[in-house]
Amino acid sequence: LPGEVCVNMTNVTHIDGTDVRQLTKAEFICREQMDAIVEFLREFVPGYERCYLVAAADNVGVRETRHFKGVTTITPEDIVEARVFPDWIATKNYFNFDIHSVVGPGLDKNGAQREFRAKGNYTIPYGACVPEKIDGLLLSGRNISGTHKAHSNFRVMGICLGIGQGVGIAAATAVRQGVLPRHVDVAEVQRQLQAVGVTP
């Protein structure tokens, strides 16, 4: 909307994103930070002297918690080398490594790399969405199998949407084929994705 700006500046560390009590603590910390951010904008940013908070997210966003171990684990090298996996289910992915500090504010020393250079777009393999030891389950979004650094790349919304589309089609295909998700005919999933314009 004209006159409104989305600000994404709150940050909390040393919180277990799987513990509801600690998440509640993080909510309080972030809400206190919002007041400080508004004051900062009013004092130091021209044009924001009379700014005020219009709305905030209902819940704190958790960037990273535990990682599943999948049949395939995505690595930073897969991303930089623009790997096209034979069992791809999400394509045309490109983003930098956006590693936030786990000990304080800002980015990790390896954070948002301004000199990031990948050879091109990479794909998400179906194997990263299939847990190594759990049957009847598919992973989608930021919880797929990948290293900490790779996760900082594929956890963003655009890539997660593509993963969700591929995994959703795979789940429906597993039901139609009457098989466990790990035994899905990935070529059939890819045919359905290609039918709606998703290509490697």
Feature map (PLM): residue ranges:
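Flavin (FAD/FMN)-binding glycine-rich loop and adjacent Rossmann-like elements that form
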Residues: 1-200
